[in-house]
Amino acid sequence: MQNNNFNTTEINNMINFPMYNGRLEPSLAPALIAVAPIAKYLATALAKWAVKQGFAKLKSEIFPGNTPATMDKVRIEVQTLLDQRLQDDRVKILEGEYKGIIDVSKVFTDYVNQSKFETGTANRLFFDTSNQLISRLPQFEIAGYEGVSISLFTQMCTFHLGLLKDGILAGSDWGFAPADKDALICQFNRFVNEYNTRLMVLYSKEFGRLLAKNLNEALNFRNMCSLYVFPFSEAWSLLRYEGTKLENTLSLWNFVGESINNISPNDWKGALYKLLMGAPNQRLNNVKFNYSYFSDTQATIHRENIHGVLPTYNGGPTITGWIGNGRFSGLSFPCSNELEITKIKQEITYNDKGGNFNSIVPAATRNEILTATVPTSADPFFKTADINWKYFSPGLYSGWNIKFDDTVTLKSRVPSIIPSNILKYDDYYIRAVSACPKGVSLAYNHDFLTLTYNKLEYDAPTTQNIIVGFSPDNTKSFYRSNSHYLSTTDDAYVIPALQFSTVSDRSFLEDTPDQATDGSIKFTDTVLGNEAKYSIRLNTGFNTATRYRLIIRFKAPARLAAGIRVRSQNSGNNKLLGGIPVEGNSGWIDYITDSFTFDDLGITTSSTNAFFSIDSDGVNASQQWYLSKLILVKESSFTTQIPLKPYVIVRCPDTFFVSNNSSSTYEQGYNNNYNQNSSSMYDQGYNNSYNPNSGCTCNQDYNNSYNQNSGCTCNQGYNNNYPK
């Protein structure tokens, strides 16, 4: 961990997240890290689950050779990344938990892998394994060590959900009665939502603590979660299906420069996350730095300062991210000439070699506009940045070096050599460059943060940092042309909500990392309606007669009278693909359309542009709905393996919200039923008052307040507080 004290002669770049080499899957984090084999297996399993073998295969990745080697490696890696080390006694407790989980799961998998076995024994061993996992999970939610424990908790949840899925699909061969299978379906959907809630509690606590301490450490933790945690929380809900795709499109950030602390969760939710993201549906085109330096009477350079970062994007004259001598109003578009960046006029002093403070008159201050422009090539993206800032001695010398790819933007003129500091992630590119202002409010403000009005300015000349945002290469295709290109070989294609073609006014960027995407769209407060359109182009040779279905992941906490529509709008051929009646739900829901072909939509050639529209009629200020992603899947390879049928809903009325109408097209519909924590930075109904029995070591489950399925004959071990 680097020294965060800037009154030293240390190089202070705040780059604590290592670069990894190699790649496993184009849609996964490019990391040779402990969780990578697990993620790779899940990506395969989501395409095709090995019935009766899925859990055993997952076990071999999480506990190879019936040892906790992988989990130990996860802990050690994350401890190193975060500089947060578990105490030895806690490590020994976890070792005991791993041993108990390995032993009971090995007994079960060994037994059912025999050519012949008693179904009654298989049934008992299955539920012994499930109950052991449930009862041991609280040991992986470690108060005060949420940063490390979230990565361990995530894999134990993945392990349990894999067991439940195998039980649902293979239960009849393991002695389950129909009522047992129904109960497992109910349990699976409940635990997907409960585990996600508990995971976000861990994340919110650690992220909020680090924001207050130091922004660079908070971003370092966020990077870790983007690789070790959030792709798996996304996989949990996708385990309900076969034929989908696990794709992580979360950004990684590198922070260089002066430390920023005392940031609140509301600051992050307000302006800071928007600054870091830039224009979310556009690639970086160029970035300008408001840079100044000053010299003494002998023309010796003493201080070099970055006062603002102005990125522009390929979609138009957006100025999201402008920091430094800006104004909240009165700035005319386009903001492209140097006259818009005013001279820095505050008095600056320096400590001369005799120990005296001398004023530098404004005339001695030099302002420059330094510009870095992406390459004009077939691959118009920055791949690397070499950015370094150094205090040579407090108050005397400081300097910057800035280089994007092979182009030097700034080479320091201070009297010493600043070493290189290359920022790069394999299989990632630079999509946004920003900075965090000091001494200004970053609180939530709808008026200047809409996605249709990317104008975010601060008068903050004390800014002295640069934040580089890296996006995974799996998003490059969209950002080259602002369209999604579909090939016949794509059995599933993921469209993050922020990769839109157009979006209506009064739409906002919301941070939803558990969806494994760079945010979701929040629609609210409109008279005419809300809409996001997504452009689809078909690659040459595409079979337009292939049948597809479209999965829409959304959340609507308030009742929307007109519901949400899914439409195709192409060359005058407007087709309604589905209508979603929304009565209020605090959790994410998957809506799945009926099948269609592109011929049906009037798209008969690869040269025609198709549009999918997700929209609703107007909503008032007290209403909102969220859109996370679209997943286009081939009907021939797609199956809902864990359905949410009316009879399950009836038995779990306090666990799920879905209409009991048997014709309902909801395919996920889980509702966490936790009270929303109003102080949370996430407007998703997460509640950090969940209180598992951390001291429990016996073979039993939580004392849950869920409605037990009174018709269930399985050995659940739940102690429910609701009447049976």
Swiss-Prot record:
GO terms for biological process: sporulation resulting in formation of a cellular spore; symbiont-mediated killing of host cell. The keyword Disulfide bond does not apply. Pfam families: Endotoxin_N (PF03945). Disulfide bonds: none annotated. InterPro entries: Pest_crys, Pest_crys_dom_I, Pest_crys_N_sf. Keywords: Sporulation, Toxin, Virulence. GO terms for molecular function: toxin activity. Toxic segment of the protein is located in the N-terminus. Promotes colloidosmotic lysis by binding to the midgut epithelial cells of mosquitos. Active on Aedes aegypti, Culex pipiens and Anopheles stephensi larvae. Belongs to the delta endotoxin family. This is Pesticidal crystal protein Cry11Ba. It comes from Bacillus thuringiensis subsp. jegathesan. The gene is cry11Ba.
